[in-house]
DNA sequence: GCTTTAAAAAGTAACGT
DNA sequence: ACGTTACTTTTCAAAGC
């Protein structure tokens, strides 16, 4: 059975962690090749890993935000690289810092074009934001799982706000069911 | 106790002044947009409801007033684009859109998506186009919307393309630039929507 | 609320050629 | 009239203004 759920692709994973140690970002900016640090602009130092491709925001408190990774494994790999780089610089890093996934962005394809006008009314104007003058996607806030889904006329969708890998799958099954019940799924 | 009394009066006066300012701003912007008095009244009601439900806290009075007017135009079936509303407001378009979404949600306005057909009479008359062109543009919008071409597209661009196509079909040709100017969209957008609509109509 | 980072979706806009 | 780049929307953490 190949359905919309099989078309789900994780596009971005955001996670947070901490090394349990305060950092001197000025010194770190000098010691870490490729680091971007503009304290006037933003308090975090930006460091990008190449493989896996990800970007980390490193803060004075030792807390770190990792974003841009394509999977949870990639988040762990990217942060592992960063932890090792810090240890190389003689900065004490906790043995296994706890990594918390904060947000997962996925895309999927429902396989049919969507009439967004009919969908806005069918799904309930109170739960829908559809302002094509400002953005071509219909914004649907789902309570369970608690995610936000962007639906497009092409049938392509974006699921964001989930913290678990299977939130996207559950959400896609749910939205397909709701659209189908309205008779709006081609 | 006297101080408390004075503060109440001060707060009440400040509130009155703010309300008066908001209502006069709605009036000023409505005049500039050329919307009828009934729409200004609807906008005033929306503003007062937002005020009563404490939706203005953390937002600018002008932003809420502008959004109330934008919402009122839609509710009354004579929408103005965010661009048009932003032109007569001192609030940036982005804030108007954000504030509109907020008050619309909180007040449960439940306004349907803007229908491109609602822009046809105003745009067409600004271009001195006949009743016949308007009817044709309306037909083009209906036919292409039924074929699913409207999803995700800007209502103003969709209306502009239909008017351009109708002006050609009725031998009252307007250039893409002329139509683009009144609808405040680019010629590129008109061209793109026009091509799809002509195909939907079975021409080509 | 803002600042920064990443990513997808599709439409619109503004460049330069 | 191309092509490219960039902006719109959503989500989330971080520290500080």
Swiss-Prot record, chain A:
Sequence repeats: 10-86, 101-179
Single annotated GO MF: DNA binding
UniProt-listed GO biological process terms: DNA-templated transcription initiation
Gene3D superfamilies assigned to the protein according to its UniProt record, in alphabetical order: TATA-Binding Protein
Matching SUPFAM superfamilies: TATA-box binding protein-like
Glycyl lysine isopeptide (Lys-Gly) (interchain with G-Cter in SAMP2) crosslink location in chain: 53, 63
UniProt keywords, alphabetically: DNA-binding, Isopeptide bond, Repeat, Transcription, Transcription regulation, Ubl conjugation
InterPro entries: TBP (IPR000814), TBP_archaea (IPR033711), TBP_CS (IPR030491), TBP_dom_sf (IPR012295)
Highest taxon in the source lineage: Archaea
Coiled-coil segments: none
Function: General factor that plays a role in the activation of archaeal genes transcribed by RNA polymerase. Binds specifically to the TATA box promoter element which lies close to the position of transcription initiation.
Family per record: Belongs to the TBP family.
Name the UniProt record assigns to this protein: TATA-box-binding protein 2
Organism: Haloferax volcanii (strain ATCC 29605 / DSM 3757 / JCM 8879 / NBRC 14742 / NCIMB 2012 / VKM B-1768 / DS2) (Halobacterium volcanii)
Gene coding for it: tbp2
